[in-house]
Amino acid sequence: MAAICLPVAKHSFPSLLNTQTPKPLFSQNLHTIPLSSQSQICGLKFLISSPSSLPPPPSYSARISVFAKVSKGSVPPQFTLKDQDGKNVSLTEFKGKPVVVYFYPADETPGCTKQACAFRDSYEKFKKAGAEVIGISGDDPSSHKAFAKKYRLPYTLLSDEGNKIRREWGVPADLFGTLPGRQTYVLDKNGTVQLIYNNQFQPEKHIDETLKFLQSA
């Protein structure tokens, strides 16, 4: 503990005794001290921070920017993106039938490959339910083409380079904003969202949940 030295005038010790009630060291008006980053009390510096002045966590603004904008019962933003063959594909082309739109992190990653192959294996069930499947990630069309060819994917993969559509739809990121989210939407024949399913670490459950919903609709 730091020692504080106070100058003492040359008086006899008894004269230093004061019979009056001592004043408190800190005034009752202490709350009027401005909440700045540094304040001085009795010559000592204290760091005082107001909660409103604290900087947000690094990923706070990023999380806000991807906070879910598309909700159940809403019509999501339209898009036109290139598919694995380099052709422009618009969401409006699928109006009149249910559409499963699933956003995934990246081609050729373990979880995304499992998810893609699970959609492939159940693709005929989706077709029987009258639905189309669309996968979207930030990979370019050539990556999608190789991915679809390698795993014999029969459905459309769209390239959202720059993740513009991901942001517009408000797909939430995972692991404190470091990992693109894995989220699936089911749109009805009118283009209205009827189901939103998010599960980063159980990619194959997206197929189970969406099929269950479509088959019960």
UniProtKB/Swiss-Prot annotation:
InterPro entries: AhpC/TSA, Peroxiredoxin_BCP/PrxQ, Thioredoxin-like_sf, Thioredoxin_domain. The gene is AFP1. This is Peroxiredoxin Q, chloroplastic. The keyword Thylakoid applies. Thiol-specific peroxidase that catalyzes the reduction of hydrogen peroxide and organic hydroperoxides to water and alcohols, respectively. Plays a role in cell protection against oxidative stress by detoxifying peroxides. Involved in both resistance against fungal disease and oxidative stress. Its EC number is 1.11.1.24. Residues 1-65 form a transit peptide. GO terms for biological process: cell redox homeostasis; cellular response to oxidative stress. One of its GO terms (molecular function) is thioredoxin peroxidase activity. Belongs to the peroxiredoxin family. BCP/PrxQ subfamily. The lineage of its organism: Eukaryota, Viridiplantae, Streptophyta, Embryophyta, Tracheophyta. GO terms for cellular component: chloroplast thylakoid lumen; chloroplast thylakoid membrane. Residues 70-217 form the Thioredoxin domain. It comes from Gentiana triflora.
